[in-house]
Amino acid sequence: MPVKQPKKLLIMNILDILRKYSDEEHRLSQKDIAEILKTEYGMTADRKAIRRNILNLMDCGYNIEYSESIRMVPNPKTGVPEESYLWSDFYLERDFTDGELRLLIDSLLFSKHIPYSQCKELVGKLEGLSNVYFRSRVKHIARLPEDKTDNKQLFLTIELLDEAISRGRKVSFKYLEYGTDKRQHSKTRPDGTERVYIISPYQMAAKEGKYYLICNYDKYDDISNYRLDRITELKILDEPAKPFEHLKWANGRTLDLATYMKEHPYMYASDNVRAVFRVAKAMVSDVIDLFGTEVTFSDEDDAGVTVTAFTNEMAMEQFALNFAPDVTVLEPQRLREKVKSALEKALEKYN
């Protein structure tokens, strides 16, 4: 039996009811709200009180929709019928549609960089943004193998990096890698001591279900990418970060994240090249998925099409190896020879 609550909580309980039980497909009358107040909150309220509190919520900025109808009601003094406005079919407009919430939840479920327990907690919070009728895919969590990261420091790492980037400070951290025991261990130096990385952080970005830190490793003048779920024991240093525009690839410009992500489809750190390659016609969708729509197609025939793309050299090499023999690098010659050599070495393994 519900515990009786003070009247001053009426407005909050009505808001809670609208959040839990209403949407465009499930509208509530004042009678419905009164019954839920009584059964779940131990409160009684007449229709005038409910309507008054709903009006107050609307005045506070809550988007509450309703339908309005007119009925004739006798004037209590004169008995003459008068128009009376009846409000009903109340529902609270959501910040997110069910489809949007499902998209967010599925993104969490199949993102391996978020620890299992924290993923489950986040899904619960997203579910709380909808109502009792919302059916998310939480069953997928129970069925998913717990192959997500073991690193429980992920969210603290993100917060500290966000602060370091805002303040323009370097950070230090240890970096994890898997051993044959299937557990993560800190990377070590040749002498066996744990290696500490000192970097200048610039941006964090998600790619292919993984979360990366784009930064500069202190010893060099180029860009490095590190998996956030493998960063541990991160500390903000007092030393100012190296400005991105001072790096050799920056050409005096600040980081353009959209361009960087487009040119680094595999998040490898190496020089960009103008790559010309031949692909089978069936590969066109894969090319656009990986390199974007700014590629140029030419010399199309039944066998294939030639593609020109400005991209990261290591990424182009990996793409050509992954999709051989349907991809043939034409230019630059240096890259063509590297791919050829890698394929020859791979073939030797099978001889």
Predicted regions and their residues:
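Short, basic/aromatic recognition patches that contact phosphate-bearing ligands
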Residues: 1-107, 192, 345-351
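Core beta-strand-centered patch of the WYL/Sm-like small regulatory domain
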Residues: 11, 146-276
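A structural signal for short hydrophobic beta-strand segments in well-ordered beta-sheet cores
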Residues: 64, 204, 234, 297-298
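Beta-strand-connecting loop/turn residues
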Residues: 69, 209-210, 229, 301-305
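Bulky hydrophobic/aromatic content
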Residues: 89-184
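Polybasic (Lys/Arg-rich)
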Residues: 254-351
